[in-house]
Curated annotation (Swiss-Prot):
Organism: Psychrobacter arcticus (strain DSM 17307 / VKM B-2377 / 273-4)
Record-given protein name: Large ribosomal subunit protein uL30
InterPro entries hit by this protein: Ribo_uL30_ferredoxin-like_sf, Ribosomal_uL30_bac-type, Ribosomal_uL30_CS, Ribosomal_uL30_ferredoxin-like
Highest rank taxon of the organism: Bacteria
Lineage of producing organism: Bacteria, Pseudomonadati, Pseudomonadota, Gammaproteobacteria, Moraxellales
One of the protein's GO biological processes: translation
Length: 59
C-alpha cells in the first residue's frame, strides 16, 4: 500500500474541534512533527480537512 509523509507546519491551537480531531487521528502533536501514514480514503479526508496546517509528500 502507498504511504504518505505528513508534516504539521502550523499550530492546531484555536482551531475547530473537528480539525483538532483530524490532527490527532493522523498522529500529529506539534509543529514540525512528521508521521508516515497509509494512503487510504480516510487518511486522505483527514489531510484534506487540515490542508492549511500540514504539508504532504509521498513516502
Amino acid at each position: 500500500m502507498k504511504k504518505m509523509k505528513v508534516t504539521q507546519f502550523k499550530s492546531g491551537a484555536h482551531r475547530l474541534k473537528s480539525h483538532k480531531a483530524s490532527l490527532k487521528g493522523l498522529g500529529l502533536r506539534r509543529i514540525n512533527h512528521t508521521v508516515i501514514v497509509e494512503d487510504t480514503p480516510s487518511t486522505r479526508g483527514m489531510v484534506n480537512r487540515v490542508n492549511y496546517l500540514v504539508k504532504v509528500e509521498e513516502a
